[in-house]
A protein has these predicted regions:
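Amphipathic alpha-helical and helix-coil boundary elements used as assembly
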Residues: 1-497
Length: 497
């Protein structure tokens, strides 16, 4: 089809003097139109111009048939008065332009999720949005994919590069629609250009080769730039000089009333691009919550994903680990808040690290306080320990001299300046105090067992052993029993001096 003239909807130009349309893969492209409008329509056009206003450029052939050649949204409108006439200039961009405005953060962790589903989620945020993957749509992501401080347009282009291919906006339809990859058509339209230019971009080939783009040869860096009045679309397959090419770029200009087009042609392999990564994610971390723990790996629910499920098992960072199995093993629990850290541009290299201290919840603090209170009544010694050193998890965070390990079941190890305290949270504790010595308190039995000797010696004072009902000392068949009423000694021989 040849365009003998063009029309712009919903605007009515009395005469169009300039029109430039640019379309390109991996780019939004744009259209600019300039022409005369009726003076009495100035205010109406200024009023109707708004964000997301759809504008369509149609080509009309010699028999009056009309086809939309560019459909997008109004980006800019300017009206100039000159010698009692009105000249209006407009700029139109495709709907995919809306995808390139706001950086976003989200993740896709389900390793079985196909790439087409990833793009479906992205495009669901746009009215009339849709993405058709001609390449790789059924492939599973296999590893986490994280969109970090990227616009949706940048993210889609990066996903496309995983398959060494390009993104093409739908320039002729309403809504944010795009295509990933090119389609090999059963037949190619033959081009008979008025003139053409050949260019070989050797540096482009070298760049792709050094970045591990497979399936290309040096001739794939050959470009043909041809002029033709026939209308073709970006990504369309054409035949030129007995070879098949694809259109990488279209530039259309108005010459009088007719539209002339300049096409950039490449081989199918010439469209291949190196795999791209998001360098912005290097050194970044995302907040989340532990959902599952297994051995030394965890699953996380990231805050940026809302209710989306967690799938990938991530390593958990530790202060020390060795291949021989030695090291520090202290895993978080489900519900703990953490950060997912990315040391490189590859999401699969991410690992979970600890989070900043958070305020102790009322439930947790209350349970800890209650546990301490119940233990405080057991003995006077225990009361002293409790009053001086609260076992509430929040209390130790107020004193930097305390190094504390506290579990959700109220188990605690407290390393202070003058003492070490081990507390089970159930009425049993051991305290080693620089000033007061060692205190062992237990709500259950205390057992000391040794395969060899046990020595109890007091060099500076007395050794006191007390029992509520009795104290028994046994050795083989000999026994001494001390009760409130009697001292009973039994054995083969008993000597009292």
């Amino acid at each position: 089809m040849k365009a003998e003239r063009i029309t712009i909807s919903p605007f009515q130009f009395t005469r169009i003097t300039e029109c430039l349309i640019e379309k390109e893969v991996n780019s939004h492209g744009f259209a600019k139109v300039r022409g005369y409008i009726p003076p009495d329509m100035e205010q109406a056009y200024l009023t109707m111009a708004c964000s997301n206003m759809e504008v369509a450029i149609s080509a009309v052939n010699e028999v009056g048939e009309s086809n939309v050649i560019y459909c997008g949204i109004l980006e800019d409108l300017q009206i100039t008065h000159k010698n009692s006439v009105c000249i209006m200039e407009i700029k139109i961009v495709p709907y995919t332009y809306l995808m390139d405005l706001t950086p976003t953060r989200r993740s896709f962790q389900i390793q079985e999720m196909p790439y087409q589903s990833v793009l479906d989620i992205v495009m669901a945020g746009y009215e009339g949005g849709a993405a058709l993957m001609n390449v790789g749509g059924d492939a599973a992501i296999g590893e986490p994919v994280v969109q970090y401080q990227e616009t949706d347009w940048e993210f889609v282009k990066r996903i496309s590069s995983y398959f060494n291919t390009v993104v093409t906006p739908s320039y002729t339809t309403s809504g944010a629609k795009l295509y990933v990859g090119l389609v090999e058509w059963p037949g190619a339209s033959r081009m008979n250009p008025v003139c053409y230019q050949a260019r070989k971009a050797v540096n482009e080939y070298l760049y792709k080769e050094q970045n591990q783009v497979e399936g290309i040869v040096e001739d794939d860096s050959l470009w043909y730039v041809v002029e033709d009045q026939e209308l073709y679309e970006v990504g369309e397959m054409v035949s030129f000089q007995e070879r098949v090419y694809y259109i990488a770029r279209v530039e259309s200009r108005l010459d009088g009333h007719q539209l002339w087009n300049t096409y950039s042609l490449k081989t199918l392999a010439g469209f291949k691009v190196p795999k791209q990564y998001n360098d912005k994610i290097i050194g970044a971390s995302l907040d989340g919550v532990i959902t599952a723990v297994s051995a030394d790996v965890v699953r996380v629910q990231l805050n940026v994903d809302g209710a989306a499920g967690a799938g990938k098992w991530f390593p958990f960072s530790t202060v020390y680990s060795s291949p021989d199995g030695s090291g520090w093993y202290c895993m978080p629990e489900p519900g703990d808040e953490i950060r997912l850290y990315f040391p490189t541009e590859r999401e699969k290299h991410g690992y979970v690290i600890s989070s900043v201290h958070l305020p102790v919840t009322g439930t947790r603090a209350a349970s800890s306080s209650g546990a301490s209170g119940s233990r405080a009544g057991s003995t006077s010694a225990n009361t002293t320990i409790t009053s001086n050193n609260s076992t509430s998890p929040g209390a130790s965070r107020s004193d930097p001299t305390h190094k504390t390990i506290y579990t959700s079941s109220n188990k605690m190890v407290d390393l202070a300046e003058t003492y070490i305290l081990l507390d089970t949270g159930t009425g049993m504790r051991i305290r080693l105090d620089d000033n007061e010595g060692i205190t062992i308190i237990s709500s259950k039995g205390v057992k000391i067992k040794s395969d060899k000797s046990v020595d109890i010696t007091s060099l500076g004072g007395k050794v006191e052993v007390a029992g509520m009902t009795s104290v028994d000392i046994k050795q083989n068949g000999s026994k001494m029993s001390l009760s409130a009423e009697n001292v009973i000694i039994s054995g083969a021989n008993a000597k009292v001096q």
